[in-house]
Structure formats: C-alpha cells, structure tokens
Design a protein with these regions (language model features):
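Phosphate/NTP-binding elements of NTP-utilizing enzymes
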Residues: 1-179
Length: 179
C-alpha cells in the first residue's frame, strides 16, 4: 500500500515492553497494516495474509490487535472459524496483558466461554468470537480480524462486515493458512 507513515515501529516497541518480539517478515506486514495516509486514516482498509501453520500468524494478529487497542483505543472484533481457536487466542493475549509493564492499562477481563473480552482503561476492547451465521449481529468495532479466513462462508462474512461500518477509520484483516 501507499502510505505516508507507519506506526509499525511504535507497535513493535509496545510489544517488546510486554515481552513479545516480531520476526522481520512480521514487522514488514505490521508496517503495511499500520500504514497511514496524510489524513491519519488507514492506507489499507482491507488487508490479508496467507501464512503456513505454526509460522507466527497468530502472533501477528495479536500484535495488530494490541497496537490498535493501546495506540488508537480501537474496539477489536477477533473472529475464528471455531470457538476453540478464539478461546486459545484470548488466553494468549490475556497473558500479554498480564505482563507487569502492560497490566496497568487493563480495566477488566471477561472469561465466560464465548463472551471473552479484554477491556482497557482507555475504552479499547477486544472480543473473541466464533463465526456463525448471526455471530456479527449487534457487534460494533473499528478493527475486524477474520482469522482462518479460508473457512469463512458468505453468511458469516455478511454477518460480521457491518460491525465496523460505523467506525471513522475501519480496517478488516483476513488471514489464513494455505490449503
């Protein structure tokens, strides 16, 4: 994408404070995903990535979500094909937010199955949802993450995309594993 500046380095510093380190290829993608126009809007409102299993895709998504929450106060909707995957991602991200240098930003963590959320003091939040035909109804946010995008169907996509339509600076990220 063509962007004037990127907050990728800010995001990397933030992650490092919480004990996470991005690989160079992840940093390149993060720079693109966090690329901004002169007006401060996302240079890419729809992004994607196809990453083989066990190569750092989840860390990349967690990093983008974390940057959105801490740097921009975003409301994030993370979706996965299965609730098991959504819950596993929640557990990993909760661990990051429990880091001694990061926990001061946390207001509340909700752990009820299927309703997991991390809410920050700045108003940012992330919800972890399984994609269902009606799973996106009534949701709202700024960043929509479609993990396991190779498994999404038209009904689930139609359910979730309106969730970010009211955002002043929406972004949708599709990632998956090659077949």
């Amino acid at each position: 994408p063509n962007y004037q500046r990127s907050d990728g380095l800010k995001a990397a510093r933030l992650l490092k404070a919480g004990g996470l380190q991005l690989d160079p290829w992840q940093m390149d993608i993060m720079d693109d995903w966090l690329g901004l126009t002169p007006a401060g809007k996302w240079a890419s409102t729809t992004c994607g990535g196809s990453v083989p299993r066990q190569n750092g895709k989840t860390l990349l998504l967690q990093s983008r979500a974390t940057a959105g929450m801490l740097l921009y106060g975003e409301e994030v909707i993370y979706t996965a094909h299965l609730q098991k995957t959504a819950t596993e991602t929640f557990e990993e991200l909760r661990e990051f937010f429990e880091h001694p240098k990061i926990i001061k930003h946390v207001k509340e963590v909700k752990t009820a199955l299927g309703r997991e959320q991390i809410i920050l003091k700045n108003g940012a939040r992330i919800k972890f949802l399984a994609r269902t035909r009606n799973g996106g109804r009534g949701q709202h946010g700024d960043l929509l993450i479609i993990d396991e995008a190779q498994e999404i169907d038209e009904n689930a996509q139609a359910s979730f995309l309106p969730a970010i339509s009211a955002s002043l600076n929406p972004q949708t990220i599709y990632t998956g594993t090659p077949p």
